[in-house]
Amino acid sequence: MKVTVDAVEVEVEEGTTMLEAARAAGRYVPTLCFDERMAPFGACRVCMVGVEGNDAPLASCTTPCSDGQQIHTDDETARRIATATVELVLSELPAEPEEHTELAEVARALEVGEPRWQGVQHEPKHDARHPYLAFQHELCISCGRCVRACDEVQGAFALTATGRGFHSNVTAGLDSGFTDSTCVTCGACADTCPTDAITEHLLLDLVGDPAKDGGPQ
Amino acid sequence: MSTRFDQSTTTTCGYCGVGCRLEAHRVDGSVRSISPAMDGPANKGHTCVKGRFAHQFARSRDRLTAPLVRENDGFRLASWDEAIGRITEAFNKIKAEHGPDAIAGLASSRGTNEDCYAMQRLMRAAVGTHNIDNCSRVCHSPTSFAMRSSLGLSGATGSFDDFEAADVALLVGVNPTQGHPVVGARIKQAAINGLKLITADPRRIELSDYGELHLPMRPGTNAALLNGLAHVVIRDGMVDSAFVDARTEGFDATAELVEAYTPDAVEGITGIPAADIERAAHLYGEAENACISWGLGVTEHLYGSEVVQLICNLALMTGNIARPGAALLPLRGQNNVQGSSDHAALPDTWTDYRPVTDDAVTSSFEERWGVKLKRERGMTIPEMFDAAVEGSLKAMYIFGEDVAQTDPDTAHVEKALDSLDFLVCQDIFDTETSKHADVILPASSFLEKTGTFTNAERRLQMVTPAADPPGSAKTDLEIICMVSKALGHDMGYESSADVMDEVAEMTPRYAGISHDRIGRTGLQWPVAKDGTDTPILYTERFEREGGLARFAALPYKPPGDAADDEFPLILVTGRRLEHYNAGTMTRRTENLSLLPSDTLEVNPVDAERIGVKAGEEVTVRSRVGEIRLPADVTERIEPGHVFTAFHFPEVRTNLLVGQSADVNTSCPEYKVVAVSVESVRSPGERPQPAELVTA
């Protein structure tokens, strides 16, 4: 079937998502919770697009295309929702995300400036018990990518989403750290994390390692 | 995209045979981080604890950075000229006095295809002997032998993608989540998504927990199990007669042979309940598309090469071959086990396994290199050690292999190394083997060289340097070319691409391979002159004379070692996730803090009988040696069996393994060693033969 993304017509297979169609058409759609290695999740609401005939924007990563659809990645409402979402996410972080992170990239692409809302920010909480993997819990935005990478790419089932609302975060095992969980140190969580909430000590060494200084022990 | 790195290079992992494509990130001249390449065909954006994290070894302070030559009882630093001068002097003297066959070389399954091809050319053209072998001798040589004999070619018939396309997969003697973690993860995901998995292994492996059925056979009884499965497939009418008639030969003899292998009879031999054998045969036989995968639990036996032929039988009689999802997928151990053998680092074959006894092929190499070559095969690794002890082999050039740790019967190997007049080791670290060397040449790791590895899918992939070799160390190819030139045979290669061009020119099945064409996503051989590669083998014909695959009617025969009153337990050895083979690399990384030492897995029933608790030290004694290590009491291992790995030099597991080896390929029988296990604290503690327990 055929769909049009920002006036670019693309031929797609049944079941193709709007995000896949947009990427096939060479159009940029910002995403935070999406990773092509895992099943679409639809949690972050950053990949919103406008669809002709639809009143409200749709999450492109979880919505399948139908024939003849006209999709707009630059839909004004969609962009406004995405930008505000990223702005809210940033407002909870104690510091700006590192430049190389996907979150920083998306914020740049959406031109999110200093957050307008000044609410509570996460307190730094680091875990440096594992020889390679480091937690910086205050950077967790609960996108669920690490948990899904652990389940759907590796199959170690070591990570779990914890807490509710502002206290949502991620933990290894029964809050026992990577080494005492079923973690097999494949690194898929660090690889997919869009904020460095899970990263490697070796990489933190390159920018100074806060996790090593402020571990819980 | 902004980055923290000075440079990122896409290359291919140098650990196991999966062939993950990696991005190696460089800061200040060294590799500081590795992440998965999203377009890697085998890893699809994933890595494991070895490929991703265990790269610190490359920056280790004890890397060899300059040549070393023996002086008195130790070594001293030397220039490249002096080191190579010593080699040429010794080799020329030995050649003059004893002939070229008094010298032997080992290429490395860790090296690139180009390194291995150059190494065999060095031995054949510069030294003048076919005494060249590589470490696939001690792991998958039985696979290579059997697949060539049954199907025609030495390689997997398909790709890892087949696990996702299959309905059923049978894993025999392989533990992918530990030994081949990225494929292990792919199989686990496939199982979660509906692939019906049958695991057959003396240990209950992690994937057994995700499978339909686990078949814990007694070590060394694989042949009985496979003939039993064939029996049920035939008895219950699951044979694909159209396929058998059109594309195979020898079915009737096999059918006749397996008649005796009733599930009850097989239960008697293997210990697997007859009902489970029936169920496994039906799962496999009734699948639309089924794969079989195996590892060293099949090959490292007295009849390993025969069991691989029995695996081929099962696939052939059900027509489960040559389609997506229907494949035979041996999981090759090292990064380049496939390629080192493909590229002629074997005593009996040229590239693409063409025999040295074939006059036309050998003539073509004589012509290409301007030398005279014999038509008789050279020595295999075990034959080399025997010849050294016996006195007819005088010198060895060992590149990238720690035979004194990894080969069986360590005491015999060390005696062989000590018997040599001259030993060259080319490696990145001092090893147990290099302690016996006369000259040690400092080489390069996979992060520092250019070339290709061939993974377990027959896929050649580019290795691209992300850092420079340390100090005055050189790439393996440079060193081999220098030594060859000093011996009077200038190979004339300017780059590793030149080596591959020569391979393509000399090898019809590899005719279209070049570094340019390999590109980012690789080529699966055979590769036609126009560059078309072959993801699935045998879609039209089998690569044997007449184009038919061959059934092999082979009975079960007992393994070379058996438990008795003195040695009542069977030791099985294998890999652990955190470490890699001799541990030369992984023990120099933080992986050591993830797994600092080895243990002996003992079933609770045996532990109680022996009187040992978890964590307590035990002595393990076999007919040839003795080691000590702590016990791990676990139900993963069946009663009557014990398990340990071979990653730690302080344990030296291979002191226990004897000389028993595969009947066709002399691959050692690492998987069946009768042992006795005693608590070191037990009252009847036996005095230790001290010379065998070297720390």
What does each of the following model-derived ranges do?
Chain B
Residues P470-S472, D476-K529, T589-E601, V605-A695:
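Long, contiguous, secondary-structure-rich segments that constitute the structural scaffold
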